[in-house]
Amino acid sequence: MHTIRTHFGGLDVGDSFIYQHYVFKKISAFHAVNGHTMRTTKFKLDQLVEVTPN
């Protein structure tokens, strides 16, 4: 697991998006004190990542 800080939002669970040449799919979400954190599946490497808009 690692964190990617980026600028995007408005994704629902199940939505896919492209970031740094990889396709991600949002599989869960929760609101933290300092912002919104999404858990995603990174298809190309088949690993979970935390994606945190800043």
Sequence positions of predicted segments:
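Intrinsically disordered, low-complexity, charged/polar segments
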Residues: 1, 40-54
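Mixed-charge, Lys/Arg-rich low-complexity intrinsically disordered regions
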Residues: 1-12
